[in-house]
Design a protein with these regions (language model features):
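A transmembrane-helix-recognition feature enriched in membrane-embedded lipid enzymes
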Residues: 1-30, 77-86
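Non-catalytic C-terminal accessory region of glycerolipid acyltransferases
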Residues: 3-8, 100-201
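Short, basic, glycine/proline-bearing loop/turn elements
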Residues: 16, 85-90, 118-121
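Short, flexible loop segments at the rims of nucleotide/cofactor-binding pockets, characterized by
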Residues: 17-23, 90-94, 124-126
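A generic structural signal for well-ordered alpha-helical segments
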Residues: 20, 60, 82-83, 107, ...
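Glycine-rich, highly charged phosphate/nucleotide-binding loops
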Residues: 26-28, 96-100
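Flexible, charged surface loops at secondary-structure boundaries
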Residues: 34-37, 109
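Catalytic core of membrane glycerolipid acyltransferases/transacylases, capturing the structured
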Residues: 36-95
Length: 201
């Protein structure tokens, strides 16, 4: 759970987006209506540090979702403090982080929304590099839908930012998915995410 009240979260969202709109005055959002009530996994491409801000900010969620973030951010002074205040779930990407997985599952089962970037870190060329299976695993284990999303990859100054939110779906995987199911589901997820951005760059 994040430490900010709903009121504070909404104030900070408006403040940060206002600042970002100075360098990107035009933001085009589509598919916001696809986000279901209750628990779901918002899963997007990741090409810049600002992606969580564009995605969470323009999804216009009533409360702050929890975001899965790489553990390396805990070593960055200001960002580390802010991420902790927002209730981010830090993940060790070098192996199976059972603590992070259990925390994420608990979050979803309590009806909260979760943001997961399958690529695990910024990918600048638009081609996923060994995406992680976490989003599909969590969806399979909790039976929560995945909501694919795409955020403009090449964020040039004063150019439009597109945030495209796709329809929710349940990956084809059993409650205790095999490695093959997880790999296939993750491949399909990345195809869906990048498919949302076709023709937008």
């Amino acid at each position: 759970m994040n430490f900010f009240s709903v009121r504070t979260y909404r104030f900070l969202r408006a403040l940060v987006l206002g600042i970002f709109r100075i360098i990107h005055p035009k933001v085009v959002v589509s598919g916001r209506e696809n986000i279901p009530e209750g628990a779901c996994i918002l899963s997007s491409n990741h090409s810049a540090f600002s992606d969580p801000i564009w995605l969470v900010g323009y999804a216009n969620l009533p409360t702050m979702p929890r975001v899965m973030a790489k553990q390396e951010l805990t070593k960055v002074p200001v960002i580390s403090w802010f991420c902790k205040k927002l209730g981010c779930i830090f993940v060790n990407r070098d192996g199976n982080d059972l603590v992070a997985i259990k925390t994420a599952m608990k979050t979803l089962r309590e009806g909260e929304k979760l943001v997961v970037f399958p690529e695990g870190t910024r990918v600048r060329d638009g081609k996923p590099s060994e995406p992680h299976i976490g989003a599909v695993l969590l969806a399979a284990r909790t039976r929560c839908p995945i909501v694919p999303a795409y955020v403009t990859m090449h964020k040039k100054l004063f150019r439009a930012i597109h945030v495209v939110i796709g329809r929710p779906y349940y990956p084809k995987a059993s409650a205790k998915p095999s490695p093959e199911e997880l790999e296939a589901g993750t491949t399909q997820l990345m195809k869906t995410i990048y498919g949302l951005g076709e023709g937008l760059q």
